[in-house]
Amino acid sequence: MKTVIVYASVHHGNTKKLVEKIAEECKVDLIDAVQQPKADLSDYDRIGFSSGIYFSKFHQTILKFASENLPENKKVFMICTYGGSGAYKSLEVILKEKKTYIIGKFGCKGYDTFGLFKLVGGIAKGHPDEKDLKAAVSFVAGLQ
């Protein structure tokens, strides 16, 4: 199956670190939605979306990319990094509109100095770590 992960990694590189490890270990293509806001995804069997979580939402670049580029009736999975907790609803709304099949969700801690976390020097330092990277690779490798 041909797989792509569309990602946005804009602060500490947490998401980029994760998806690059996945691409290294699994046969997937990567699209940086910040650098390439338009892409034809019709040839892909599985499409992943990945970003950090900002105030309980996927990054706006990912939400816009999914709204504008995602074909209907595709198998889709989500990967997020977060300081607080994972949140998928913002993207799930778009995926539902596109009549997709959600085949999985994965999230892990990521170093976060966004907003108020900056005042305390950040949270989840050192993440994603090796354990997180291995778990992400296992998640993608196990997708049907």
Model-derived regions: residue spans:
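A short beta-strand-loop structural module common to alpha/beta enzyme folds
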Residues: K27-K38
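FMN-binding flavodoxin-like domain, especially the glycine-rich phosphate-binding loop
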Residues: T3-V6, V10, K16-K17, E24-D29, ...
